[in-house]
Regions:
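Membrane-interfacial helix-loop segments of redox and metal-homeostasis proteins
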Residues: 1-178
Length: 178
């Protein structure tokens, strides 16, 4: 019975590691992923690539659930692109980034459902909003989801324990904790 318990514990640990989100997050990688999201959204809108919504939605859901682990884009950025840039890591708090990925998942899943129902123009609106938010993140380190997370912390919806590093998010330099 002892080895079965050990095996179960090992499996639980593996699942816990799989379904974890990095904390801290390298802001350089986060901004590169955001830049790729901008490109994907713009291509989808410009060329009516409805199938691109599947890739976007999968990517956001994968990143919310597992960080970059099950996200092909996350893997490409964290394992290939960022290391080759030769720039210093810029660690920022993980929970606000995960929350932002969740908002991206909601927008991309909405676009996917709308596209699937034949409402491509409505889907394009959600893709355009997603592209705008990703552009702000990638170009200016302005993470709208992170700012929303900070507001939710400030009003007590998100407890301080969720992200102790975030408790003074407004006083930090842009992008440092958001």
């Amino acid at each position: 019975m002892g080895s079965g318990t050990r095996e179960t514990t090992t499996q639980e640990g593996a699942l816990r590691r799989l379904f974890s989100f990095p904390n801290p997050v390298n802001e350089v990688s986060a901004r590169l992923v955001a830049a790729a999201v901008v490109v994907m959204c713009v291509l989808a809108i410009a060329f009516d690539l409805e199938w691109m919504t599947v890739l976007l939605a999968y990517g956001f859901v994968a990143r919310v659930l597992t960080g970059p682990t099950l996200s092909p884009l996350g893997q490409l950025v964290t394992r290939v692109i960022t290391p080759r840039l030769g720039v210093r890591e810029r660690p920022v708090a993980g929970p606000p980034k995960r929350f932002a990925q969740g908002i991206g998942a909601a927008f991309s899943l909405t676009a996917l459902v709308l596209a699937g129902l034949g409402h491509w123009t409505a889907a394009e609106v959600f893709l355009a909003l997603l592209a705008l938010a990703a552009l702000l993140e990638s170009a200016f380190a302005l993470c709208l989801g992170c700012k929303a997370f900070a507001v939710l912390m400030r009003v007590g919806v998100v407890p301080d324990e969720v992200c102790e590093r975030c408790t003074n998010i407004w006083a930090t330099t842009p992008g440092a904790a958001a």
